Amino acid sequence: MNIFQTSLKCCVGLVLSVGVLLGDSKAFKVRVDKSLTPPFLNVLSLAFKQDMKKEIVFVITKSNKLSKKVLCDFDAFLLPEALMGDMPEKALFHKEFLFQSKENKTLYAFSLIDSQYCSKGGNYRNELEKLERWFVQKAPELAESYRVNYKNQYNKTQTPQK
């Protein structure tokens, strides 16, 4: 093998390694409703980071009338059932009901974006399925413990309140 081929293989290997590393560090974007409080979203975010070693970003949007381009910027949705019902059916994949708010009895549902709807494939589907499994397993228990321990809320910038 000559020097050019060796250099080319090293360069391609480096690009692939960096691409995999950067791809793994991408945070999941989850659209949420303003009714979910920032302290509860912090609880979800910190638990997700601890369990999955990956970041999650919660994005609050004002309008439910979102274009396909805007919807495809999200990896998943955590919304009240009523708002989830207004979303295009083709955009959602595996809608799951997770928990109910104590105050106004709002039922919250979680759904992944359908990767075929957004023309995303490959490893993206596997990553989304990991996100879904975590939410289905952990979010209901975190919501319940958050309700029970509401006087002991944690915020990233505060110490526990009593």
Segments from the language model and where they lie:
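Classical Sec-dependent N-terminal signal peptides that target proteins to the secretory pathway
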Residues: M1-D24
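Ligand-binding clefts/hinges and TM-proximal coupling segments of bilobed small-molecule sensing domains
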Residues: Q116-Q161
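Composition-driven detection of intrinsically disordered, low-complexity segments
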Residues: L14, D86, Q158-Q161
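Short loop/turn hinge sites at secondary-structure boundaries
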Residues: G23, L71-C72, N149-Y150
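Low-complexity intrinsically disordered segments
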Residues: I3, F58, Y154-K156
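N-terminal segment of the mature folded domain
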Residues: K26-C118, G122-Y124
